[in-house]
């Protein structure tokens, strides 16, 4: 079973990494092309392209300028510990055992606008480049065109290496759009998390993101290899709904918090 998640906008390069080892991203030559292109943008252009404040635009211009290889433990950090958003709050990789890190390295991948696809222990330097960014390159007018089939091919390689053909999609639609399902050598399982509010169960973004991280943690810590076992997920009050689930979509419900 291979699981994929989105990255996060918020980053944490301050806290010490407790990971037992590190690895190198496999698509850095493509990342370098995006960095070279992004360095040609002024802070004002970055702000306009990413729809962010002047302060953030300046920060990201500085990040593009500072980005350099080779990545080391001194100038970079393992991706699963560097990302710091809602999904990663649920995942809580800082509390992983060495065994958890080892399992995650084989069974988890992080989609990224800059790095394409990351293993949890891949070193990365700080950046902000969301997959939906309309950055024009020699390959097209956006990052989906830039990455083309590259991410899907890497996922197929990871699926083959870890031993079955099940891919659990815990990523947002913005990021999973970079994957080409028809070219994927696997069955896509899509967990959906709904919370009860105002008389009905619905997807509430903050809770759903955290739940995706909790599900990723559940898969990693329990070494889940059977799709049926995903239905046993009951962390933080969620429960599987046979009634609302259909096909490869597994729906989990939670009563009002």
Curated annotation (Swiss-Prot):
Gene Ontology CC: cytosol
Matching Pfam families: H2O2_YaaD
GO biological process: response to hydroperoxide
PANTHER family assigned to the protein according to its UniProt record, in alphabetical order: PEROXIDE STRESS RESISTANCE PROTEIN YAAA (PTHR30283:SF4), PEROXIDE STRESS RESPONSE PROTEIN YAAA (PTHR30283)
Family to which the UniProt record says this protein belongs: Belongs to the UPF0246 family.
Protein name: UPF0246 protein Patl_3620
Provenance organism: Pseudoalteromonas atlantica (strain T6c / ATCC BAA-1087)
């Amino acid at each position: 079973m291979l699981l994929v998640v989105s990255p996060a906008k918020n980053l944490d390069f301050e806290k010490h990494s407790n990971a037992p080892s590190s690895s190198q991203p496999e698509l850095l030559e493509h990342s370098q092309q995006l960095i070279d292109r992004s360095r040609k943008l002024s802070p004002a252009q970055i702000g306009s392209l990413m729809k962010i404040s002047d302060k953030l635009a300046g920060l990201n211009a500085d990040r593009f300028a500072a980005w350099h290889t080779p990545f080391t433990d001194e100038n970079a950090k393992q991706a699963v510990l560097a990302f710091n958003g809602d999904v990663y709050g649920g995942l809580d990789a800082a509390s992983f055992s060495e065994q958890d890190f080892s399992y995650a390295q084989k069974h988890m991948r992080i989609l990224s606008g800059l790095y394409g696809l990351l293993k949890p222990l891949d070193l990365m330097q700080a950046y902000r480049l969301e997959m939906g960014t309309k950055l024009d390159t020699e390959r097209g007018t956006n990052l989906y065109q830039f990455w083309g089939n590259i991410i899907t091919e890497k996922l197929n390689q990871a699926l083959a290496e870890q031993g079955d053909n099940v891919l659990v999609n815990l990523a947002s639609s913005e990021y999973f759009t970079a994957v080409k399902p028809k070219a994927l050598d696997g069955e896509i399982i899509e967990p959906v998390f709904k919370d009860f509010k105002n008389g009905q169960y619905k997807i509430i973004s903050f809770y759903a993101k955290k739940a995706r991280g909790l599900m990723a943690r559940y898969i990693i810590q329990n070494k889940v290899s059977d799709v049926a076992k995903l239905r046993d997920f009951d962390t933080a009050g969620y429960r599987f709904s046979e009634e609302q689930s259909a096909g490869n979509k597994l729906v989990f419900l939670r009563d009002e918090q």
